[in-house]
A protein has these predicted regions:
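Non-transmembrane "mature" sequence context
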Residues: 1-135
């Protein structure tokens, strides 16, 4: 007999495997490291985006399982990277854009916005571009 709890667990596993979540639902540090390196994102840059030290990121990338307290910032960072990459076109353009002063952000760099806790400004820009607000 299948219980409600079993059904909920199965549904949760399916959701984590769905294409929408597959890109950023990492459970292990090695999977995160492999993804980050595959995207060509240096550890110092990803650490800045995830708002952690480079040493902390290196430690967690060596773990078999990511700690819960670290999973959320990682998932949020990966979602932001994927959204910005979609708009920038490729990894090289994104890395350059993150470090270049932008008139839309009062000559601040997008990376400085991330460091300053103003990720919502970047998400607002992503939303506006996706909706065609600048067309």
């Amino acid at each position: 007999m299948i219980t409600t709890t079993t059904k909920k667990k199965a549904a949760k596993k399916r959701a984590l495997r769905s294409p929408a979540n597959k890109a950023y639902a990492f459970k292990s540090g090695l999977a995160l490291k492999t993804w980050r390196q595959g995207k060509g994102i240096p550890r110092p840059l990803f650490a800045q985006i995830a708002d952690c030290s480079e040493r902390t990121l290196a430690t967690y990338e060596g773990k078999a399982r990511l700690p819960v307290k670290f999973s959320r910032p990682v998932e949020e960072s990966i979602r932001l990277i994927l959204a910005l990459e979609e708009l920038a076109g490729d990894n090289a353009a994104l890395k350059e854009w993150l470090q270049k002063p932008n008139a839309a952000f009062d000559r601040r760099t997008p990376l400085s916005l991330i460091k300053g806790g103003e990720v919502d400004v970047l998400w607002g820009m992503v939303h506006q571009i996706r909706q065609g607000a600048f067309a």
